[in-house]
Amino acid sequence: MANTRNIALNVLLKIENEGAYSNIALNNAIKENRLSGVDSSFVSALVYGVLERRITLDYIIRSYSKIPLRKIETKTKNILRLGILQLLFMDKVPDSAAVNESVNLAKKHKLQKSSGFINGILRNITRAEVKYTLPDENDRAQYLSVKYSVPENIVKLWINSYGENNAEQLLASLNGRAKICCRVNTLRTDADTLIKKLSDEGVVAEKIPFINNALYLENTGSVERLRAYKSGLFHIQDASSQLCVNFLDAKPRNIMLDVCSAPGGKSFSAAQYMSNRGRIFSCDMFDHKLKLISAGAKRLGITCISTLLRDASINDTALPVADRILCDVPCSGLGIMSRKPEIRYKDDLFSNDLPDLQYRILCASADNLAVGGKLVYSTCTLNPDENNKNTKRFLEEHPDFYGIPLKLPNGIARAFDEEPYEITLMPHTCGTDGFYISLFGKKASN
């Protein structure tokens, strides 16, 4: 029988010590250990539970430990986090198992001195009538930070940018697994047929009401094993990204640039809007990412995509003039923390270099847009410095461009006042990842 807690600990250490991505580290561990469905689910719950609640868990450790948190060795700290998670946030794990298995885990890693320390803290928690008390509610940033396990600098950013009500609902939406969404490959099938085929494989599929040919999926297991996936009948893509391509409105025979394309999902969706007729140039700085795009296009039967190795921040006169340009730029990723909870702990989330890079990509890309064409600038983050401020500056400095009002589908609404050409999608208002989309057109120069 697999030692699931040890596997979870090793994944957490890889994420914390080596900067590994949670989804990749977890998937690799599940495959390497050949875990059953039940064991996979338990390991996933442990890993994501600790990542989603780390600030809360560390706050609880501080309240019970005489040793400062910074002086507790990393392995010991993560074993404590796992133990407290099971005691306070996982109802199906008996207290005795949470305590005993945590102590055994410490001994397995030759942490003999730490095993007694871990045992003492966990047993004190089990005996306490009030397990822990949150900080004073009057200090809103600290209170919300500990309650929802998000760093105070992000909490303050969202309160100042979106208002306290939006900020708290946004924070509350982060924990728990995000919905799996897919785009139906309309070159090979339709939504109703795909729903039936997925049902035959035990997958529950439901149409997303605010965008055509998009489905919510449940009970997928490993998506790559599904016959419908292998047959190229769909690709995984959140509804926010699908809306982004929808607003771009690519047409058959268009020439399109996808300037930061990898892993290619938006290019694939655009190709379907174009009925696989026209040209899409999918660009990235790294050759191995371009190979992923080519492989995905081949699986889906898409032939109108060509890949280009290039730096999107540099003007390229060799590129064709394009009818449609998609600038889905590198970003801090604050909108996808429900999928990658470790993002919140990164040290460089608020680097000034990132908005500057994004702006250079936008300006360089705009040079290739045809008069009368459309350009989408988008990110998967929730930070006005990377979103609204960049696009406002772009319009101020590019008089030959104008904002095109977005036609929002039923079920999609702005959470706060924005310009008609832009929307910040929020999980609590739209049921999507956090995402920013803006749409621009180009007029003839005077």
Question: Where is each model-derived feature located?
Answer:
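S-adenosylmethionine
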Residues: 1-446
